Amino acid sequence: MRSGGNKYLASLLRCYRDERCKLSGKVIHGFIVRMGMKSDTYLCNRLLDLYIECGDGDYARKVFDEMSVRDVYSWNAFLTFRCKVGDLGEACEVFDGMPERDVVSWNNMISVLVRKGFEEKALVVYKRMVCDGFLPSRFTLASVLSACSKVLDGVFGMRCHGVAVKTGLDKNIFVGNALLSMYAKCGFIVDYGVRVFESLSQPNEVSYTAVIGGLARENKVLEAVQMFRLMCEKGVQVDSVCLSNILSISAPREGCDSLSEIYGNELGKQIHCLALRLGFGGDLHLNNSLLEIYAKNKDMNGAELIFAEMPEVNVVSWNIMIVGFGQEYRSDKSVEFLTRMRDSGFQPNEVTCISVLGACFRSGDVETGRRIFSSIPQPSVSAWNAMLSGYSNYEHYEEAISNFRQMQFQNLKPDKTTLSVILSSCARLRFLEGGKQIHGVVIRTEISKNSHIVSGLIAVYSECEKMEISECIFDDCINELDIACWNSMISGFRHNMLDTKALILFRRMHQTAVLCPNETSFATVLSSCSRLCSLLHGRQFHGLVVKSGYVSDSFVETALTDMYCKCGEIDSARQFFDAVLRKNTVIWNEMIHGYGHNGRGDEAVGLYRKMISSGEKPDGITFVSVLTACSHSGLVETGLEILSSMQRIHGIEPELDHYICIVDCLGRAGRLEDAEKLAEATPYKSSSVLWEILLSSCRVHGDVSLARRVAEKLMRLDPQSSAAYVLLSNTYSSLRQWDDSAALQGLMNKNRVHKTPGQSWTTYGNDLDSGFRK
């Protein structure tokens, strides 16, 4: 009778649990206590189930504590409840106190650790489980693989894959999807994930979504599109997460193959239409993804239309719009959206303010950037970094350093980004003392061997011509340096005219086989080849460029063109230039300059006219290049016509360099009076360089009278310059007026004016050396 009564009570408790009738359950609880049935573990487990289902933790705890005998079910039930409510501390306490555990116990503990963000601890618990002789279930592996995904531990994930194969769980859709997600996030979707997908008998929307996301992360554009197409053909339901993943491949990203440009914004628009057709028009996450795609593809008009039609927006939506307009140099729109955001009741977060700051500085609106920064109550280090980066990128280096000092007064500790920005500013200003102070700060911190910091320090000392210090810093950290530091050191050698050392260091880097040269490495070392006029080395590096896949990089293309031009291989330069698919203004300028440098002025002018007819807009450097070519080839009238067209047709105001070219052109042609008139009529008549050019022409044509007049003007403009004395002395010497030349040398000594020694390069076989001559 007693046993039958217990079964009846247990049945009632199950019914009350299913219906969540806690009050009725408490009545039964009271009856059990009065009848002395608390020792019945089975009944107590039913009470525990009731209170857990009703979410009454206090009574569940009371029942659990008062149980005289607890079995594995009791422990698991209470552990499951503590895990469900997220009470990690008590869950660990219950788990550690369990006299015996089963797979459910381990699964609960691993699951709660993963959910609460303790993935590493979850993996440790899993290892303990295996050591205790328990075989993982599908729930175990799913949780452990989720932990591997979050900590990006693909190696441990592969071990779990092996366990799944041995236990036959790899074909289970639950485990299979977890494997796909892990491989996708760890970057192994192509190597291993696709095989897992193919082994699943009936992949579902989660399977397809994971594979598409992984392929998108690895920039496998075509494969991702094909997988999405297969998903649609199989009739698998497409959800908003899948659409977000496929959308991500239509955004331009570094390292993405050319197919991303083919699909690009067009694919984004197609997915947008599909999302509307499938009824996801109100999905906030998907709409934010769409906004981001339009913004990244520089279609802010389209993004603004989507934003206006969104039924719901959040801070992320506003931030995407603000960043997008900033990338397009439209700070006015960024500020407008910030104002609208506040008016709509949204509180801008730090990301918002930093985004607006970036937009303002990117657009050159420094004053608005200052106001936005001043409106931040307590700027964080990230906000200061955005401000300092803005000043530095806009070439306001002094203000960057000044604001850095203000930041220090706020008792904020600069991070590696802060110090990198300030080191860059010090390098640009050649502010050695400031660089040394930052160096001291770096030595006292744990970031002394951070690659960005090391690169910045090398740049500072190189710009300040302290190459011995740069080399010490480089050698001290050589085993921990990345490509940026090597590039900085190579660039330092090039900047200090140590081009041979630049070539040697590049070879050393290439021979290590640890780091591969990038486009910056090649552009820098090719520049050194240009200055050394070393065609042999230049061709070797050209071969490496092709082998490394950087031949279509715009900087490398320009450097190669320049190298061939400087080495006198003008036809090779033109052949390479013609093969360039996307010519920008810089490479046009380089080729025009190359023709001029090699005395082929007619071809330089012809290429200039071809540039104009192609629709490429010339800049100031274009005109310097073509006017120089006119000067060296005696194309006086053509040069004057091109100078006249600068302002009249192209809207470019001639600067000093342009007038120098024309004065030189007129002077070379013997039209010295015209050259003098032009020099007097320019806004730069107080520039000594302009008159030095004219004085040099006087020597060539033997015009002593004009030479004296110009030399006197030069001496007034720059009394300590040796140019006037040397050029006038050379004029006297060319006309055999030795007494006048000697008198001028005496005057030069009397006034303590010294001539700067020249430098020349000497080639010994394949090696290069430099020497000085006076």
From Swiss-Prot:
Keywords: Repeat
Family: Belongs to the PPR family. PCMP-E subfamily.
Species in which this protein is naturally found: Arabidopsis thaliana (Mouse-ear cress)
Segments of this protein annotated with the region Type E motif: 690-765
Protein name: Pentatricopeptide repeat-containing protein At4g20770
Disulfide bonds listed in the record: none
PPR repeats mapped onto the chain: 5-39, 40-70, 71-101, 102-136, 137-171, 172-203, 204-238, 239-270, 283-313, 314-348, 349-379, 380-414, 415-449, 450-480, 482-516, 518-552, 553-583, 584-618, 619-654, 655-685
GO biological process: RNA modification
Gene Ontology MF terms in the entry: RNA binding
